[in-house]
């Protein structure tokens, strides 16, 4: 048995990063909602 979460900075940014969010309409919606809510961190 080993830990299933093997964090990688590059992979995380590629999947959940700002540019990835901006690239799709639904991603932009996510950012808009998070801005409305007042999140300090919008993306990973």
Curated annotation (Swiss-Prot):
The keyword Ribosomal protein applies. Keywords: Ribonucleoprotein, Ribosomal protein. GO terms for cellular component: ribonucleoprotein complex; ribosome. Residues 1-44 are annotated as: Disordered. Signal peptide: none annotated. Belongs to the bacterial ribosomal protein bL34 family. InterPro entries: Ribosomal_bL34 (IPR000271), Ribosomal_bL34_CS (IPR020939). The gene is rpmH. HAMAP family: Ribosomal_bL34 (MF_00391). This is Large ribosomal subunit protein bL34. One of its GO terms (biological process) is translation. GO terms for molecular function: structural constituent of ribosome. The keyword Ribonucleoprotein applies. It comes from Clostridium botulinum (strain Eklund 17B / Type B). It comes from the Bacteria. Residues 7-22, 30-44 have a biased composition (Basic residues).
